[in-house]
Regions:
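Serine-hydrolase catalytic machinery in alpha/beta-hydrolase-like enzymes
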Residues: 10-12, 16-103
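Active-site nucleophile loop of the alpha/beta-hydrolase fold
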Residues: 41-42, 134-144, 190
Length: 213
């Protein structure tokens, strides 16, 4: 798979937002399937747009013909502002979506803290603009109040979690998903960062992206 990478500077509520756009090398005349916005893990614990899980998600989307935009939340890298416990970060994500994907098919994905922020972006955007695909990995349900996934978005949503995640226990994600009857795909033996299992993670995401709604 060949991909083209471009660095972007977008405008956010706290100032400039550093972002990277990864595009699939498409045949002449072919259009991308849409734009996928991918959110990184907790900024105060080293989370950036270059996180390995985030990059794996981007590769999966690009393989399936999507253009992806990974970005740094406020206070990370060259993105201006300071950490805001998810409130400002939600506004960052919404600003990125508005500028990088103003129209056409949209997908949202996030890892850990990024999955928490993504859940609230889905909640905010679903009524005016339904996403084609949603991917939540290592969702930080034990540390933050994760928004429920809209019922009519369940078939478009993939929730992935490691069986042996010691950062966000699997039980916390099951407790969040159970009232929604939202399926959770569990990676046997998987930890929070899916060490040694990133190829499997990618394949599971690709399978989801290739499935119907």
């Amino acid at each position: 798979m060949n991909a083209q990478t471009e660095r972007l500077t977008l405008s956010g509520p706290a100032g400039a937002i550093e972002a990277v756009r990864d595009s699939a090398a498409l045949a002449a005349g072919a259009a991308p399937r849409g734009v996928a916005i991918i959110a990184h893990p907790h900024p105060l614990f080293g989370g950036t747009l270059d996180n390995k899980v985030v990059q794996t998600l981007a590769r999966a989307f690009v393989q399936c013909g999507w253009t992806t935009v990974r970005f740094n939340f406020r206070g990370v890298g060259a993105t201006e502002g300071v950490h805001d416990d998810g409130r400002g970060e939600l506004q960052d994500l919404l600003a990125v979506a508005q500028q990088a994907a103003p129209e056409g098919p949209l997908a949202l994905a996030g890892f850990s803290f990024g999955a928490f922020v993504t859940s609230h972006a889905v909640e905010a955007l679903w009524a005016p603009r339904q996403m084609d695909k949603i991917v939540l990995v290592g969702t930080a349900a034990s540390r933050f109040t994760v928004a429920p996934v809209p019922a009519d978005a369940h078939l478009r949503t993939l929730v992935l979690h490691g069986e042996e995640d010691d950062t966000v226990p699997l039980a916390a994600v099951m407790d969040w998903a159970r009232p929604q009857t939202l399926p959770v795909t569990v990676v046997p033996g998987g930890g929070h960062f899916f060490h040694g299992q990133l190829p499997l993670l990618k394949n599971l995401v690709v399978r989801h992206l290739q499935s119907g709604r």
